[in-house]
Amino acid sequence: MFLRLFKYLWPERYLPEAKKGDPFENPPTPLHSRTGVLMVNLGTPDAPTARDIRRYLGQFLSDPRVIEIPRYIWYPILFGPVLTFRPKKLAPKYAGIWMDGGSPLLVWSQRQAEAVTAQLREDGFDVPVALAMRYGNPSIADAITGLRGQGCDRIVVVPLYPQYAASTTATAVDAVTRHVARLRDQPALRFIKRFYDHPGYIDAQAARIADFWNMHGRPEKLVMSFHGLPRYSIELGDPYYRDCLATAELLRAKL
């Protein structure tokens, strides 16, 4: 027991001769830093089958950030009728929109990540970009492992939600930090919380709308639709509703 303790306290005295010396003389990893980007979207089933949809819904709907009611009330409902019957009903609908590369969300998210990679290279930045899904694949764990394998010891995490909500952005942050907490050599993390009012985002949205108007004519009214949240989420402090109003007003002014 004492020998093990001494080896722990003074390992250099018990290491073979070849392993002694300055530990920084031949470091196991490069000392320079490299930044990577992790883009996180919501998630998707792996295939438009009841089995894969059930797995996806189980992950998604068991997240306490998404369903904020007591587990003892919700779980019997979720693992009873919801996961028993809902996947079979959804499978034909998923199959109807499925693309060659997977679900539309996955395909377009991958294209978005590729476009960000290309833009960074064009701007002169050697920055790896990885895509992850909060629920399903590609997983956050695999994406971080991939970035670490490319030498990234700093990771900028970008949840792909312009407006902040606990059920979207916060749960992505939870998942990333939970995985990194298990690592011995942890990368430095920086999170982009939201970008609802960023000029680049507003300009991009305005340009898409203007392009549509140029092709089809300018309508009398423009309806801006955002994903909904339960009222209690707003009452508990989610800034999502305010963010949506601000985005709409900025777009209105831009157009």
Task: Indicate residue ranges for each PLM-predicted region.
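Active-site-proximal alpha-helix that buttresses catalytic centers in soluble enzyme cores
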Residues: 2-255
